[in-house]
Amino acid sequence: MSWDEGFADRYDEWSAGMTEDVPFYVELARETEGPIVELAVGSGRVAIPVAEATGRPVLGIDTSPAMLAHARERADTAGVELVLREGDMRDLELDEPAGLVYCPFRGLLHVPGWADRRRVFERVAASLRPGGRFAWNAFAFDHSVGARLDGSHQDEPVPHSLRYSVGDNRIDIALDNAGTSSLWWATRNEWLGLIDVAGLEVEALYGDFDRSPFGDESREYVWVTRRPG
């Protein structure tokens, strides 16, 4: 079974423990004028509450047909409008500039390398209206955590194994009886470089979804950036 098929079938189990991000992105959407776009929309875990809270459609983009099928089914059940599109965030093109583009659940970490991430950031910046926001969250970079996880097998939230590659700051996640997916960590300075090269401005860097400041003990980057104008 491929990662796409295996992970799509178990995504809701995998993400069950991640709920605190939903109110954060919902609040950003409520503050937004203009179209709302979610990158790596997955099964609609965040997009559906955003659409429910705002009463507006959310454009969701994902590379996985299996995940989009889950999102479509869940949106129909919830009675909300998601406009779902199969596509790569590196090639983002919108019919109308967005007021908010967001990428929850560390989705940007699946984009490997500086060049590809730069392309994402530049496409997002070009797709925002003046004053529009780009928000995302990601693990705070920590070699010691990666080293501790290397070679481990975990049963929760679903059975999987982890491998850490020091050379390129990569974590490989292998689901039992399914494929493997990878995350590439980025440092704070690397994120700041991407923000700068795309012509965005930092509005806030939080250490959690309660909007507490990022500090030495923070384990999550929660970024909110803005296109000038």
Residue ranges and their predicted role:
Residues 93-100:
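A short acidic, Gly/Pro-enriched loop at the edge of an enzyme's catalytic core
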Residues 118-130:
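A short glycine-rich, Lys/Arg-flanked "PGG" loop and its adjoining helix->strand segment in the class I
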Residues 188-229:
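C-terminal lobe and adjacent flexible extensions of AdoMet/dcAdoMet transferase-like proteins
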Residues 47-91:
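Class I SAM-dependent methyltransferase SAM/SAH-binding core
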Residues 1-42:
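Conserved class I S-adenosyl-L-methionine
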Residues 102-104:
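A conserved beta-strand element that flanks and buttresses the S-adenosyl-L-methionine
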Residues 113, 135-193:
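SAM-dependent methyltransferase
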